[in-house]
């Protein structure tokens, strides 16, 4: 399909990533994402592994990697070894977690712990950005976050100390423009190849976490595996 459409190349030139992404409409930024090159790995027909490893998705020498979540995918409950953050920028998506279904709507953000069996489905032209963060380097990359006394820090500390229970945190941001700007800039930095892009992504993640706690700490919804249910602060 890509070859017939003239979209498959042996080599690609670096895209121009110098625009003013903060003030674009969702449709304008979606076109920018459409123009970003993708590196494809040929599928050999073997069954998909039930657990996605960090190295399967996050490029070498990166601690943070951002993609626009694929649309119209087949259901595939899976686990992975990294933290996944899904932000619904436009529309909605179906979040399946431990046999439960949730519809995430525009402005909602969900942090999924490693080793949690889940799936995320987009069945229309909605836009969801997925932030992948290495678990293996999290405690050093986000050291300042680990020393704070809030539920977000507790969530990460508990997991990094060896708790492998399925878990998630959810924020309801009312589609805050500041959060969206941070994630857009993370997405663009993930597409850059210079020596500064990883550090920039880390900085935007820290800004995003701080903004979430500053404005939306009272909206946190936490999957409590001991209770088997959600509760809100």
Where are these regions (language model features)?
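Extracellular carbohydrate recognition
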Residues: 168-171, 198-202
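A short, Lys/Arg-enriched amphipathic alpha-helix from helix-turn-helix/homeodomain DNA-binding modules
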Residues: 178-180, 201-205, 209, 221-233
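Generic protein-terminus/edge-of-domain signal
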Residues: 1-92
């Amino acid at each position: 399909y890509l070859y017939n459409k003239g979209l498959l190349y042996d080599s690609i030139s670096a895209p121009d990533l110098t625009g003013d992404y903060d003030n674009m409409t969702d449709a304008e930024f979606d076109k920018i994402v459409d123009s970003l090159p993708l590196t494809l790995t040929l599928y050999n027909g073997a069954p998909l592994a039930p657990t996605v490893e960090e190295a399967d998705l996050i490029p070498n020498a990166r601690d943070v990697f951002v993609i626009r979540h694929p649309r119209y995918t087949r259901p595939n409950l899976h686990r992975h070894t990294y933290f996944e953050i899904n932000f619904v920028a436009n529309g909605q998506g179906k979040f399946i977690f431990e046999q439960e279904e949730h519809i995430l709507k525009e402005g909602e953000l969900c942090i999924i712990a490693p080793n949690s069996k889940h799936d995320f489905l987009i069945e229309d032209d909605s836009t969801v950005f997925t932030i992948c963060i290495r678990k293996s380097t999290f405690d050093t990359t986000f050291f300042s976050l680990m020393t704070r006394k809030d539920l977000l820090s507790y969530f990460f500390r508990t997991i990094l100390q060896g708790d492998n229970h399925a878990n998630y945190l959810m924020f309801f941001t009312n589609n805050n423009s500041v959060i969206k700007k941070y994630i857009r800039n993370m997405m663009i930095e993930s597409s850059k190849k210079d020596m500064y892009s990883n550090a920039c992504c880390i900085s935007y993640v820290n800004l995003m976490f701080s903004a979430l706690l500053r404005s939306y700490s009272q909206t946190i919804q936490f999957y409590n595996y001991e209770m088997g249910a959600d509760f809100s602060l």
